[in-house]
A protein has these predicted regions:
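N-terminal hydrophobic signal/anchor transmembrane helix of membrane proteins
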Residues: 25, 121-126, 224-230
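Secretory targeting signals
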Residues: 31-83, 107-176, 210, 214-217
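Membrane-interface helix-boundary motifs at transmembrane edges
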Residues: 17, 96, 100-104, 167-177
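Terminal transmembrane helical anchor/hairpin motif
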Residues: 2, 6, 35-65, 173, ...
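Helix-loop-helix units of permease transmembrane domains in multi-pass membrane transporters
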Residues: 83-115
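Aromatic- and glycine-rich beta-strand/loop motifs that create alpha-glucan
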Residues: 1-26
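Residue-level recognition of transmembrane alpha-helices
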Residues: 27, 109, 183-184
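Juxtamembrane loop-helix boundary motifs flanking transmembrane segments in multi-pass membrane proteins
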Residues: 1-9, 102, 141-146
């Protein structure tokens, strides 16, 4: 059993390392958007970009639609879902009839998923500090202090780890369909809602990145249409 666990962790760690291309694209695109944010004053929307939004606050104030934050979450979704997808097959994953193998498989996923979540959160801490330092001038009314930023990062870390671990644990004792439903309910009910529903939409898609990309694009489009139909004339893209 111990050798099996070590082997699974090594395999999942190797899969995690193979995400470097997506990580580079993700980090690079976020930094480019940050530079664009620095070039344009967006007032209160900057606070939404840094602290994130909940589903409820998005629906109530779609004019404060944080484009950079949504792209941030889509990037995280691509990385995390693809990490799971690479090893979710009927031959090697939770469809194994042998329960001990299935248990160790998901233990490895929980461990490596936590490492991935921590790495992304560290990057986002640095990224948010960059935005705050760029807007430290008195010309901008950014009502964010260090306590608010710390609380935001703690929720971000807990939210990322919990949504991943919840899916793994439910799938261990049930199956992926139940895990997907539980994760969706977890987000919609707003327990630590830092992520919209599309964060866990791709768990059902294990047939390739194209299918997941289509699913994500459709759900992001739905959120955009909600914002557009409610307050399209008040949406703030790059300027007040």
């Amino acid at each position: 059993m111990k050798n099996m666990m070590v082997g699974l962790i090594k395999r999942d760690s190797w899969l995690l390392l193979h995400q470097w291309r997506r990580l580079v694209v993700y980090f690079g695109s976020i930094l480019l958007i940050d530079i664009m944010l620095v070039m344009y004053e967006r007032g209160a929307v900057i606070e939404q970009e840094i602290l994130g939004v909940s589903v409820q606050s998005f629906l109530s104030e779609p004019d404060k639609f944080p484009i950079q934050w949504v792209w941030n979450q889509v990037g995280i979704l691509i990385i995390v879902i693809d990490f799971i997808r690479k090893d979710l097959s009927r031959n090697t994953s939770c469809f194994m009839p042998h329960i001990p193998k299935r248990k160790w498989y998901w233990y490895s996923k929980i461990l490596c998923g936590g490492v991935l979540a921590c790495g992304i959160v560290v990057f986002q801490i640095l990224e948010k500090q960059f935005i705050l330092s760029a807007y430290s001038s008195a010309d901008y009314c950014i009502n964010i202090n260090s306590t608010m930023l710390l609380e935001s990062e703690i929720l971000l870390l807990l939210g990322m780890c919990t949504i991943y671990w919840l899916y793994a644990i439910v799938s261990l004792f049930g199956n992926e369909i139940i895990g997907f439903i539980v994760c969706t309910a977890y987000v919609v009910l707003g327990l630590p809602v830092k992520f919209p529903v599309f964060y866990c939409a791709g768990f059902m898609y294990r047939r390739g990145t194209i299918g997941m990309a289509i699913a994500m694009a459709g759900i992001v489009l739905a959120f955009t249409l909600i914002a557009g139909t409610k307050k399209i004339n008040r949406m703030d893209i790059f300027s007040e």
